[in-house]
Amino acid sequence: AAWLHDIASITDYSLYVLHHIHGAEMAYGILKEYGYDNKKIRLVQECIKNHRGSVNLEKNSLEELCVADADAISHFDSVPSLLYLAYVQKGMGIEDGKEFVKNKLARSFQKLSTESKQHYQNKYEKVMEVLN
């Protein structure tokens, strides 16, 4: 699930808005091709469907929670990529780009489980301090 959770948006950006749904469908074909049984495929599909932080879906397993948290946590280690997205790909000005990245990180932090928020609080605060 961790490897496949963003596959739809990576292979076709037009699928981004519903990439959690399309990705789960794509994962079925990939995993079936590699001989995974249907039970494991369904578990992976649920992780992919429920990883999307901007779509507030209940996490029904520890695996779903882990994939969703890891997806959000990854943003704190990819600030340069987020800045590139804002300034180069989206063509934003200095302040707008900075606010875009800060808002993305704030949303990501709010999506974390309670345990992950406690663990990543300091890192989140340090990254936000640099951006301020």
Regions found by a protein language model. Name each.
Residues 4, 14, 53-132:
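Divalent metal-dependent phosphate-bond-processing catalytic cores, especially two-metal-ion Mg2+/Mn2+ enzymes
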Residues 31-38, 54-58:
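Short helix-to-loop capping/linker segments positioned immediately adjacent to catalytic or ligand/cofactor-binding
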Residues 38-49, 124, 128:
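Short, well-structured alpha-helical segments
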Residues 20-28, 45, 98, 102:
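An amphipathic alpha-helix signature
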Residues 1-14, 19-23, 43-53:
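His-Asp-centered metal-binding catalytic motifs of divalent-metal-dependent phosphohydrolases/nucleases
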Residues 8, 24, 28-32, 106:
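Amphipathic alpha-helical segments within well-ordered protein domains
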